[in-house]
Curated annotation (Swiss-Prot):
It catalyses: a 2-demethylmenaquinol + S-adenosyl-L-methionine = a menaquinol + S-adenosyl-L-homocysteine + H(+). The keyword Disulfide bond does not apply. Pathway: Quinol/quinone metabolism; menaquinone biosynthesis; menaquinol from 1,4-dihydroxy-2-naphthoate: step 2/2. S-adenosyl-L-methionine binds at T58, D79, N106, A107. The gene is menG. It comes from Geobacillus kaustophilus (strain HTA426). GO terms for biological process: menaquinone biosynthetic process; methylation. This is Demethylmenaquinone methyltransferase. Gene3D superfamilies: Vaccinia Virus protein VP39 (3.40.50.150).
Amino acid sequence: MHQSKEERVHRVFEKISAHYDRMNSVISFRRHLKWREDVMRRMNVQKGKRALDVCCGTADWAIALAEAVGPEGEVYGLDFSENMLKVGEQKVKARGLGNVKLIHGNAMQLPFPDNSFDYVTIGFGLRNVPDYMTVLKEMHRVTKPGGMTVCLETSQPTLFGFRQLYYFYFRFIMPLFGKLLAKSYEEYSWLQESAREFPGRDELAEMFREAGFVDVEVKPYTFGVAAMHLGYKR
């Protein structure tokens, strides 16, 4: 039976939720932590503000945002995988954070009014949605005027030689890690497919502009295997 992209992605994340954090560290050689630290530094999140992390998964970025805005601020994390949210809830509870709420929802139809958040983020989630532009426009809609939306995502390396090595690693090695460490070869095969098909830096920057963002900034990481895109709402 043919599955839609949304159905397939949901099945993938429901299955790998218990191993997701560990596998992220293995696959990226823990570089994803440094990438997000740099993005947070560039965002310069202010105390008392409101933030939304779309496709929050196990809530790492939502937690970082909650710590940054402080107890006077408010953070929502949204994901469509109940199992990923359960892992995230455990992490939020362990840190004693009372200013972050994790909710089950769909990035294609964010359950928030227009102009709700000072910061809207999505980390390693945009490549998994059915329609990139729909989600970017939804993120733009709920961002306050003057606020920012930030995407941290895999990208397409441009350095010759390294690009070929990257594609080999993602296509053949990463699924093996999934099989050995998480018993999930098929699921990690999907993740490499979604990364391979995702737009490059320039194309995604143009999509940000088409969605309504201005002053779009792009920062590549580790020879372009990942990139930050940051845009503001007028």
